[in-house]
Design a protein with these regions (language model features):
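N-terminal leader/targeting and accessory segments in enzymes
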Residues: 1-92
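Phosphate-binding loop of NTP-binding sites
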Residues: 88-232
Length: 232
């Protein structure tokens, strides 16, 4: 299992292969990662991804879909690579595909219940006035010089995070300021991002439907500082 996944990572590093977690955008030869979601399990969409041309499906082993999965995949000439944590698999593949682990861009994360958007906007202005080319990923928009788009999520999924970081670097951006939500930390959306620094604005009662209690909420926020990789 580890050897098969390592081969996928190497294929992504070489380029020429795309990674998807949405079966609706899968194309011929893509890698589809069946990520378990809050409301839907990505494993449900494996047949659709295979039909769309996925060359490889990454999913959890031992799931109820295994028997039907193996039959349909083999019939279509696709193969299955198992991973105990598809969310981890997704960000590792994204990091390999876009080579963000070797990025020279300084990436700063801002987390907290309130004040993330204000803080990132202030940092954007400060770094811009200091002569830097700045990119921002946040609640209002994803933007950098020459590009701006509306933000459907405060922190996008790993494929979007890593692809946009690569686009920013290619555009000459040297500082990125990113809003990091607690949902994003919990769902591994910013794992593999080589943060150079981070800021914690505050912690007040919010999102307890997701985190259950304030202690869990705090521990999730703290992971940005305790667990995520750091640039040297």
């Amino acid at each position: 299992m580890q050897r098969d996944f390592a081969a996928l990572l190497e294929a992504c590093r070489r380029g020429g292969v795309e990674v998807r977690s949405d079966s609706r955008v899968v194309g011929q030869g893509d890698i589809f990662v069946a990520v378990p979601g809050v409301n839907e399990d990505g494993a449900r969409f494996i047949p659709a991804a295979v039909e769309a041309g996925a060359a490889v499906v990454v999913c959890r082993p031992g799931g109820p879909e295994d028997a039907a999965l193996q039959a349909s995949v083999r019939a279509e000439g696709c193969r299955v690579v198992y991973h105990e944590d598809p969310r981890e698999a997704l960000w590792r593949l994204a990091e390999a595909r876009w080579r963000t682990g070797a990025s020279r861009v300084k990436i700063l994360g801002v987390t907290g219940t309130n004040g993330k958007t204000t803080s990132t906007s202030l940092l954007e202005r400060l770094f811009t006035d200091a002569g830097h080319k700045v990119g921002v990923l946040g609640t209002v928009s994803y933007r950098w010089p020459g590009h701006s788009e509306a933000a459907p999520l405060t922190t996008p999924d790993p494929l979007r995070v890593h692809s946009m970081l690569a686009q920013m670097e290619a555009a000459g951006v040297d500082v990125v300021v990113m809003e990091v939500s607690s949902h994003a930390i919990d769902q591994q959306r910013v794992c593999g991002v080589p943060f150079a620094g981070a800021a914690f604005t505050n912690l007040t009662q919010d999102h307890l439907d997701f985190h259950k209690d304030m202690e869990s909420y705090f521990k999730t926020k703290a992971r940005l500082f305790l667990e995520l990789p750091r640039a040297e």
